């Protein structure tokens, strides 16, 4: 009995091994055939695919590849006979008509090809189950109109089928944005769950230019749908569109409409406000935060909105800023819920009011009440900034180092590392600054990574070689003085590079690597002092020396803004906005330049 059981076990085991070996052989053959096919070795691929198809005649992948191999080797008759034989054995496999049609298409027999395509489409009325396969084949053969017809036929005969997504993608391939957007919108209309998917695909066509053809068509499609079939989702999409176009006030209007219908959630408005603030659209941002303050019952949400209102007051130099902060502390107190407001207030005291000691006291009090290590880190970051402002570098570096130790790999630790690099740069310790910046170039936070790369390149491009002065030490010191709001001293430091012969034998002249950076910093300081014409002179000198500088689009935008907002020279403003539009189409200033140029030209909004 034991021997019989052992024999059965060995037999079954042998069969299993043989089966696994056979499957492995098939997989290896399929991989080899596919490799030959992709490399264009169609004769070799044909032999293997034929063997695979003969052993698995129901495998449509093998069939498709075999037919394609026959076509690529001009064996059209063999392909035709194979397909007709397959159809003869099963007339329900209507996708075979597409193969047959394309077989004639490859032979330039257009009319014959169309006959088979029509048969395939008509056959779907009786066999809609093959609709997806037929449409997919049409798409693969770039027969996009036929693919759309196939999907629509299936949907007409099967009310549960929904191929609007596939249809929309095909319209996109055809460049028919109107139909594409209509199909995507229909998909959302049928089921809101498609929202994120559709938004992701639509974003491939939407730009930040409100005059972009796709943007206009998408907006019109949404407005038509909103009128014929009102749904909250259309407002959400319009809000998203306006946000992409930096039309934040219009986005707010859509969110207000949603809020009026369903009061409660203000997170979208808070997000729009923050984006507008970061993008320097302060009026629109203020509208968002004012609305939250007026409508929200959530204390934390209200405090957050007030924080940004205070930040806007600081950046726009509102004379009532001090009063605004004091009122906030009267209403909400100085506690853990207002820590960010306390940090913002300390920043205001230091960099706007030149009261760093008072700011230091505010932050020391905040630090004593903070319980979260993240809150403590934020406070220490600002304390470090204030200590640098006061020239107490070593104490500042201690705070920054503490954050790095306590919050390893966190965004705040990366920010602290950048502060270490920046402080080291200010001190003239360029090697240590570069060591920190090398680590940060791969930062997960894009803004920190960008700042790190910019500072690293500034040091690398301008640092002294073989102890020969390069002016970098003087530039770093001028930047420190500017950070400390000692603008006149900073300008004096920079002017010495042009006048004195200590660093450059002939003074700083075009051709020196540091020339652009020095003039650019001078221009920014002169703008701050409202010496706009002098700033224009400095910026123009950079362009004269090198109009291909990486600063060129920054310079053009700065000049356009000065002419537009401060010197009231609309003609010159248009000239420089236009330079960005036509000479720097990938510039971060493109959207604003285009909008402002159109406004100055008198275009209707």
Predicted segment positions?
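Positively charged n-region of N-terminal signal peptides that target proteins for export
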Residues: 1-4, 19
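Sec-dependent N-terminal signal peptides
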Residues: 4-13, 467
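Acidic, polar-rich low-complexity tracts and alpha-helical solenoid repeat scaffolds
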Residues: 18-605
């Amino acid at each position: 009995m034991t021997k019989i059981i052992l024999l059965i076990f060995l037999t079954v085991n042998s069969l299993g091994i043989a089966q696994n070996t056979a499957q492995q052989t098939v997989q290896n053959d399929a991989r080899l055939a596919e490799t030959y096919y992709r490399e264009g070795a169609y004769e070799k691929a044909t032999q293997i695919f034929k063997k695979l198809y003969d052993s698995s005649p129901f495998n449509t992948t093998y069939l498709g590849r075999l037919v394609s191999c026959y076509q690529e080797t001009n064996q059209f008759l063999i392909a035709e006979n194979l397909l007709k034989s397959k159809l003869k054995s099963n007339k329900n496999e209507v996708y075979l008509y597409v193969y047959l049609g394309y077989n004639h298409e490859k032979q330039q027999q257009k009319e014959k090809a169309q006959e088979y395509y029509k048969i395939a489409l008509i056959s779907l009325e009786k066999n809609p189950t093959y609709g997806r396969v037929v449409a997919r084949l049409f798409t693969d053969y770039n027969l996009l109109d036929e693919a759309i017809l196939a999907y629509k036929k299936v949907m007409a005969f099967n009310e549960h089928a929904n191929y609007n997504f596939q249809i929309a993608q095909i319209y996109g391939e055809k460049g028919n944005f109107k139909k594409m957007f209509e199909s995507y919108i229909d998909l959302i209309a049928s089921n809101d769950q498609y929202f994120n998917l559709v938004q992701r695909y639509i974003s491939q066509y939407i730009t930040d230019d409100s005059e972009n053809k796709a943007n206009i068509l998408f907006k019109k499609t949404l407005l038509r749908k909103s009128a014929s079939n009102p749904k909250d989702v259309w407002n959400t999409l319009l809000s998203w569109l306006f946000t992409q176009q930096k039309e934040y006030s219009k986005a707010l209007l859509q969110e207000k409409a949603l809020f009026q219908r369903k009061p409660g959630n203000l997170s979208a408005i808070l997000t729009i406000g923050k984006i507008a603030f970061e993008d320097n659209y302060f009026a629109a941002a203020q509208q968002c935060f004012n609305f939250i303050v007026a409508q929200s019952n959530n204390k934390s949400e209200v405090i957050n909105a007030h924080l940004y209102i205070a930040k806007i007051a600081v950046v726009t130099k509102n004379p009532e800023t001090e009063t605004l902060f004091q009122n906030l502390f009267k209403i909400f107190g100085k506690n853990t819920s207002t820590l960010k407001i306390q940090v913002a207030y300390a920043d205001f005291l230091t960099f706007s009011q030149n009261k760093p000691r008072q700011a230091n006291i505010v932050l020391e009090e905040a630090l004593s009440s903070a319980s979260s290590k993240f809150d403590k880190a934020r406070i220490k970051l600002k304390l470090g900034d204030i200590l640098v402002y006061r020239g107490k570098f070593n104490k500042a570096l201690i705070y920054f180092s503490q954050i790095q130790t306590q919050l390893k790999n966190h965004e705040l630790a990366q920010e602290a590392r950048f502060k270490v690099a920046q402080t080291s740069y200010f001190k003239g310790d360029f090697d240590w600054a570069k060591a920190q910046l090398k680590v940060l170039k791969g930062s997960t936070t894009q803004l920190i990574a960008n700042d790190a790369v910019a500072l690293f390149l500034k040091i690398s491009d301008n640092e002294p070689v073989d102890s020969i002065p390069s002016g970098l030490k003087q530039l770093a010191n001028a930047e420190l003085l500017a950070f400390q709001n000692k603008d006149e001293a900073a300008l004096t430091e920079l002017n010495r590079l042009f006048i004195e012969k200590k660093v450059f034998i002939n003074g700083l002249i075009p051709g020196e690597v540091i020339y652009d950076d020095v003039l650019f910093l001078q221009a920014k300081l002169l703008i701050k002092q409202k010496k706009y014409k002098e700033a224009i002179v400095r910026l123009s000198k950079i362009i004269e020396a090198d109009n291909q500088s990486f600063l060129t689009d920054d310079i053009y935008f700065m000049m356009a803004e000065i002419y537009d907002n401060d010197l009231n020279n609309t003609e010159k403003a248009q000239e420089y906005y236009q330079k960005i539009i036509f000479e720097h189409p990938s510039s971060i200033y493109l959207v604003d330049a285009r909008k402002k140029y159109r406004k100055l030209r008198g275009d209707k909004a």
